[in-house]
Amino acid sequence: MPRVCGCARAPARIGVADVKLLLAENLSPRLLTRIRRFYPGSRHVEQVGLKGKSDRVIWEYARQNDFIIASKDNDFRQRSFLFGPPPKVIWLAVGNAGTEAIATLLTEEVQTVREFLAQPEEGLLILGKTGSSV
């Protein structure tokens, strides 16, 4: 079970509408239809004209538009360590898991994601095999 590290206080109440993900290019755009109810306002990089753009450009777009970046790519995890939030990053440590498995993970962990969003000092949430945040 993932957790948000260093959370001694109760997290602020975060509503469903507050959590919007920017899905990295390594995730299927079809994922959006499976998570829409839990993450309204989420987008895939293709939808916002960022397909093929650099990680730096995607990072800046997410920062300016209040998105949490969701990715299986290690590069955004590393950027999180280097630059900190915003934006926040959800690193999906799921190997070659398919769209359905990733959708299930994200929907089952929606409360964890909300708690993560409520902690301004937290920049990285790892969901999947390792199940922790930094």
Region roles according to the model:
Residues M1-V19, S133-V134:
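Intrinsically disordered, low-complexity and often Lys/Arg-enriched segments
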Residues K20-I68:
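N-terminal first-folded block
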Residues L23-A24, S71-K72, V94:
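Small/polar loops that bind or transfer phosphate-bearing groups
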Residues P29, F76-Q78, S133:
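Glycine-rich nucleotide phosphate-binding loop and flanking beta-alpha elements
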Residues R63-S80:
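Acidic, metal-binding active-site segment of PIN/NYN-like and related structure-specific nucleases
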Residues R79-K88:
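Ligand-binding "clamshell"
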Residues P87-S133:
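C-terminal structural segments of small proteins and small subunits
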